[in-house]
A protein has these predicted regions:
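Conserved acidic segment of CheY-like receiver
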Residues: 2-13, 17-18, 52
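Hydrophobic/aromatic residues located in beta-strands of well-ordered beta-sheets
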Residues: 4, 30-31, 79
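Two-component/phosphorelay signaling modules centered on CheY-like receiver
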Residues: 11-32
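Short hydrophobic/Thr-rich beta-strand motif most characteristic of the beta2 strand and flanking loop
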Residues: 25-35, 43, 91
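CheY-like receiver
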Residues: 42-148
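DNA-binding recognition helix and immediately preceding turn/loop
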Residues: 144-164
Length: 164
């Protein structure tokens, strides 16, 4: 399951996130719902979530600052901006810092599941790419170990590149 943390300063939105979204169906585990950006950053450091859902306007650290922080420190983390503002400058900032999706609160029940599906799809693709790269590295490591072993066993003999 993908680990999700969320932050919104409005209590009814926090409750909606906890109770109205079928997280298990989305293959997600909502591990924490917080009320400000500073708590969210602390939680990100402790929990290492795969997906972060954040409101824009919150006390202390706002959601756009959280988005920028994740872009700079944990670029693989998928960010979903949840906001009451359809302001183009906010959307532009979110795009600049690689937010996965921008969801308006008035359509949270319709758009958030789609945004989560998009985020989990990106994470699944990223995981496959990492596994593929790790497999290639492992194969190269095995080949280098075989070459090293051969050279160690035969270093006193004449070895030409043609022979190898």
């Amino acid at each position: 399951m993908w680990k999700v943390v969320a932050a919104d300063d409005e209590g009814y939105i926090r409750e909606a996130l906890k109770k109205l979204i079928n997280w298990e169906k989305m293959n997600c585990d909502l591990v924490s719902v917080l009320e400000d950006g500073q708590e969210l950053i602390q939680c990100i450091e402790n929990e290492s979530p795969d997906i972060v859902i954040t409101d824009i306007q919150m006390p202390g650290v706002n959601g756009l600052e959280v988005c920028k922080y994740l872009y700079e420190t944990r670029p693989e983390t998928q960010v979903i901006i949840l906001t009451a503002y359809s302001d183009f400058d906010y959307a532009k900032f979110a795009i600049k810092y690689n937010a996965c999706e921008y969801v308006l609160k008035i359509s949270i029940m319709d758009e958030l599941p789609e945004a989560l599906e998009k985020a989990t799809g990106k994470l699944t693709q990223l995981k496959k790419e990492i596994e593929k790269e790790e497999s290639a590295v492992s194969e190269q490591r095995t080949l280098l170990q075989q070459i090293d072993q051969y050279v160690e066993q035969n270093f006193k003999n004449k070895i030409s590149m043609n022979y190898m």
